[in-house]
Amino acid sequence: MSKPGDYNAVRRDIAAQLKKPGYDDGSAGPVFVRLAWHSSGTYDAASDTGGSNGAGMRYEAEGGDPANAGLQHGRAFLEPVKEKHPWITYSDLWTLAGVVAIEEMGGPKIPWLPGRTDFVDDSKVPPRGRLPDGAQGADHLRFIFYRMGFNDQEIVALAGGHNLGRCHADRSGFQGPWVNNPTRFSNQFFKLLLNMEWKPKTLENGVSQFVYIDPEAEDHEEPLMMLPTDVALRDDPAFRPWVERYAKDKDLFFDHFSKAFAKLIELGIQRDASGKVTNTDNVKGGYHSAPKKSDEPTGPPRPHTAQRAAKL
């Protein structure tokens, strides 16, 4: 057990959990980033609810949300870290895991401060439906992200997280990676989005996405994919200039992503001038069993229809 407050020790142990032979592309890094993202992206500025406080995915109301399907793996991978450092809250652990994963996969350093607390029951878990739906378009992205307090530039910067990981048909309904090296943080997502010919494809489950098939690729190689929301970034006149800038300038993208992600994981957190959290509506909670639905190997896919996606 480490000394309370030894976050460097926690960082080291998170980094030690990244290598996962047999899991997606051999790395837990992308799922740690998604865990930090989804645990923070429920924030609603108007009501000041949701956000990175609480670790609500420990409860069925949030953890069982189909939008969070697959994140049970990320939470399980971090349990040995929690057991070794029982003083850290889940909400701090999950957000820190995303920060460490991005840095370890070659991404920018992201400011992170501790102090989040965990819900002791599910009474403050935010309602479902606050996370982005990849089957939608530009209007949906603005509705979701403006609600949290982000602008168009920050929306595009955060979308660069799609340099990491892959989609799974039994989770989101979509299938495949965005880039050829989904465990290395880069600006490749933006380059591919602009330069490749993305063709619509309807999967066997009825979900529509966009794919690029390299004619020179080996037969066993998986085609790359883009979500309808990704293609909307390319086609929207206000989003596209940022896509173009990030495709050309990796350093600019890294700088903007770092700032936007730091803002994301602070949503719902109030601090004084010293950085101490001043939220008073929460106390530190203990361990809670993983939610039933999201404790299964895979969760149910989000409801999508080819007809709705085709309208984008």
Curated annotation (Swiss-Prot):
Q: Where does heme b bind?
A: H162
Give cofactor(s), names only: heme b
For this protein, what is the EC number?
1.11.1.-
GO biological process entries: cellular response to oxidative stress; hydrogen peroxide catabolic process; response to reactive oxygen species
Name-wise, this protein is: Putative heme-binding peroxidase
Kindly report, in one word, the top-level EC class recorded for this enzyme.
oxidoreductase
Q: Where are the catalytic residues? A: H38 (proton acceptor), W178 (tryptophan radical intermediate)
GO molecular function ontology, one term from the record: peroxidase activity
Q: What family does the entry list?
A: Belongs to the peroxidase family. Cytochrome c peroxidase subfamily.
Q: Where is this site: Transition state stabilizer?
A: R34
Keyword entries, A-Z? Heme, Iron, Metal-binding, Oxidoreductase, Peroxidase
State how the cofactor is bound. Answer: Binds 1 heme b (iron(II)-protoporphyrin IX) group per subunit.
